[in-house]
Design a protein with these regions (language model features):
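Non-catalytic interaction-recognition regions
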Residues: 1-131
Length: 131
């Protein structure tokens, strides 16, 4: 289905590209890459869900390689994108309540962008900085 494959919603390449471009845009607006977290930051459910998913990436890549199953990387990156978009729609990154929270969310956004880029690279797909 041509329309589904070009959709910015759900399981599609453009959806992943859009999520990556969104992350890069947020990081560009931050105008800094030197984020420091000095105090403990209280994490939301959405942030914890993202951290748990990020933690699984090396295992997913290893399993995908051992089983010759690139679909495992596809499933991972779609799940990651959905979790990030849910987080983004629930919490402000650049307008967080505290500087520590803002810095944590920027670091989280940077990690998500890197994992989307790494996942797509493993699948032979280049990322787009803007859409």
């Amino acid at each position: 289905d041509f329309e589904k494959s070009l959709s910015l919603q759900g399981d599609s390449g453009p959806y992943l590209q859009y999520t990556y471009a969104r992350c890069r845009s947020i990081l560009g607006k931050a105008r800094s890459t030197n984020f420091e977290i000095r105090n403990n930051v209280e994490l939301s459910k959405e942030e914890l869900d993202l951290l748990r998913t990020i933690y699984k990436f090396p295992e997913v890549v290893q399993e995908a390689a051992e089983k010759y199953a690139p679909n495992l990387v596809c499933n991972f990156v779609f799940d990651l994108a959905q979790l990030y978009n849910n987080f983004y729609n629930t919490h402000s990154v650049l307008q967080a309540d505290t500087e520590e929270q803002k810095h944590f969310r920027l670091l989280l956004t940077s990690a998500v962008a890197q994992l989307i880029q790494n996942s797509l690279s493993l699948l032979g797909i280049q990322t787009l900085e803007k859409m």
